[in-house]
């Protein structure tokens, strides 16, 4: 006792030390501290406990750590470091993830006692020892029976009688001491990937009441002292745990694999037993326990399923007809070996069955071989078509329990041949006191319902443990009256009453709820994903276990969490009538319902937040697409208008253009200018500055305001020189339209404008629109070349003809119309300041204000960077070409001179010479 209590307190001490040093000490230092303070066996024990606790979290990567627990290292120091690193890592994962696993961590003795009390209340009444019989800590270490109904560790009353059946610990020096393979039965499974039905893992022959244990238990309270890693064994522990019947066997991987080479199918399989409500009283009278443990129905999981018509699944060809194969309890056991760990089922895995009730198979029927309803194996059909009345013959009541079975009755229920006759009508349910006709569907239908209801109970993490194999049993509460009232702590009674008392009313509700909205489909999909884990097969809650919709009697929306919550509420209210004499169970079920509601609300809120974020992205994308479509339309329309304006202005006379072009441009700017001003995209430059706007957006804005600037050949000078309506990036002048031919007016406006805010933008846009309406006679005349020379400073060469053809359709080069019109009178470009000064003379001298108002010279303006394409080295190449051209000219001139001289000589000199001679 004292040694066990000290061991528990010792574990609590280590956990408290981890918690205190978690945020202050580094990972490496914490591992070193653990290695220095504790022995390997203690660290291995703590790792095992932390691993089982963390497996309660479905997001815990159990497979990674399980592989580490399998490996054996000969070097003790290396193993110690690995174990310490695993301890720190698992502890940090538990602390970060929170939830169930974090709540299970005992941080103090008081917390350990509280957890024990809660776990004691979760177990079935036949297995819980009275609080007055044992102390809390000792209850945890030595008095916990395993929840499947194999009390290898008995209460202190019965310790002396049954202590020989307790397992023996393996010493820590054993290399494979983390791999426990004994006959001790556990309730959960962290799979070692071996068939549980195989028995030759130990030397001694198995007893009928025992089952091969090849799985780690998943409940920390049920397995506080792990059988894999032991603390130093004291005399008190030896008296409790040393088994005289059979040693604790650990076999190598070669031996385990050799099993499959042998004739292991003919070996004896084990049969788990059922612990009834009268179990404790019979044990006190000394009746052998092996007689009572033969009433356990087989449980199975199809993680190791065989092909369709295997002889080992057929009772006719079964080599062991008198033994039942034990397989996994449920799909949870398979999930325990997956990456995400076991499903978050909070309660213990007790069967919570009473001996008088018709023991039935777990609500998980056969695995889905396919989605085709016709492709169902024979043993599955026999499973669905069986009758609980046969089970009554096979599994008797508590009043007429018999220690032995006849040979044919020992077959598992799912191996019963199809041709067995039904003893009772389908409308009758088996009860201990006789046959009762109930207004419910047949038990076969109920079993089909349960496969689906099982999903829903797990999807909200119901803590009552309703996934046990008796949830679809018809008789539930009648047998409970033989129990003492102080021991009625079964939290699952609400779920049992729910399934028994409201099948009639819920069946009609199922048919009415046919239509489900999108959010229900989302919830159902998420539930299926959370249930399936990483097994790769989504066991959809809309289907039954064979993947058949035709065999399903439930509506589609039955599996949604909203409907699930309503079912729980109805179940609790319906079960209150049967449990008026058990108020504490009602209280427990209400607390359980509240916790389930809280978890469901939190989950709904989380999913809603995710959906809101997705909805926001979708709205933004739709807005952006809509704006792009509008911009494309606005780009196409002004281009058509401006092409007509350019053609008219080039062919028409000046007086008609002076009167017509302002009207056309006013219509264009009035229709498109204010719209652009009010759109959100054009307002971003005031906040984010010059770097926030993309080049495309700036070009689009500029193009919409600069297209109408070409009037006619007479107004071409002032239009191209000013580049009207350019958009500057600074808030001061981004909408201020400046005309160099209206310097007196625009200079005052620029000075008085100051930093503009949102209120001034509409006013400025209207002013910009009014500027286009100014009659031409008020504009001051300018020299033709004055506007071009400023641009020619940073416009080294005109556009090539091939580039123009490509750029005419590109919205980034929408000011090409200006340069095209300018090329009519554009002279030779200026390459340096001397040429520029020589070409312009006095007219080329620009004031500081001129430089500020000219868009082509303003680095903050987009036109400064997008005016022309300048190729580096182009001027040197051009000068070389010019030099070659000059050289060719000189050569031509020299050739002409030489030819002329030769001609003169030949024509004049030669005849003269000939004449003289």
Swiss-Prot record:
Bias kind Basic and acidic residues: ranges: 576-588
Transmembrane intervals: 893-913
Modified residues (Phosphoserine): 712
Compartments, record wording: Cell membrane
Induction info: Up-regulated by NGF.
Amino acid composition bias (Polar residues), ranges on this chain: 460-476
Keyword Metal-binding set for record: no
Membrane topology: Single-pass type IV membrane protein
Segments on the Extracellular face: 914-917
Cellular component per GO, a single term: plasma membrane
Alphabetical UniProt keywords: Cell membrane, Membrane, Phosphoprotein, Transmembrane, Transmembrane helix
Cytoplasmic side: 1-892
InterPro entries: MINAR1-like, MINAR1-like_C, MINAR1_N
Region Disordered: start-end pairs: 337-367, 389-410, 457-476, 568-588, 652-679, 706-727, 746-783
Biological processes per GO annotation: negative regulation of angiogenesis; negative regulation of cell growth; negative regulation of cell population proliferation; negative regulation of neuron projection development; negative regulation of protein ubiquitination; negative regulation of TOR signaling
Family: Belongs to the MINAR family.
Physiological role: Intrinsically disordered protein which may negatively regulate mTOR signaling pathway by stabilizing the mTOR complex component DEPTOR. Negatively regulates angiogenesis. Negatively regulates cell growth. Negatively regulates neurite outgrowth in hippocampal neurons.
Quaternary structure note: Interacts with NOTCH2; this interaction increases MINAR1 stability. Interacts (via N-terminus) with DEPTOR (via PDZ domain); this interaction may stabilize DEPTOR protein by impairing its ubiquitination.
Protein name: Major intrinsically disordered Notch2-binding receptor 1
Naturally occurring in which organism (per UniProt): Rattus norvegicus (Rat)
Taxon lineage: Eukaryota, Metazoa, Chordata, Craniata, Vertebrata
Name of the gene encoding the protein in the UniProt record: Minar1
